């Protein structure tokens, strides 16, 4: 079995674990339609920052 040679300090242990927890994705609400979407992405109905930028099937 593998055995550590030297004890890992609390600082190094913290740095090792620093990226382990997950953060929630930043969510934005489209002001014109109220749709929820990822920030800096076009909403499902084709709006970005209050303007229609993509034609959808319903248009």
Curated annotation (Swiss-Prot):
Report any Pfam family annotated for this entry. Answer: Ribosomal_L32p
Enumerate the residue ranges of region (Disordered). Answer: 1-59
Q: Which UniProt keywords apply?
A: Ribonucleoprotein, Ribosomal protein
Question: What highest taxon heads this organism's lineage?
Answer: Bacteria
What GO cellular component entries does it have?
A: large ribosomal subunit
Among its keywords, does the record have Ribosomal protein?
yes
Q: Keyword Ribosomal protein: yes or no?
A: yes
Please name the InterPro entries in this protein's record. Ribosomal_bL32 (IPR002677), Ribosomal_bL32_bact (IPR044957), Ribosomal_zn-bd (IPR011332)
Q: Which GO terms describe its molecular function?
A: structural constituent of ribosome
Look up the coiled coil feature and give its residue ranges: none
* NCBIfam families with a match to the protein in the record: rpmF_bact
Which family would the database say this protein is a member of?
Belongs to the bacterial ribosomal protein bL32 family.
> Record's PANTHER family?
50S RIBOSOMAL PROTEIN L32 (PTHR35534), LARGE RIBOSOMAL SUBUNIT PROTEIN BL32 (PTHR35534:SF1)
Protein name from the UniProt record = Large ribosomal subunit protein bL32
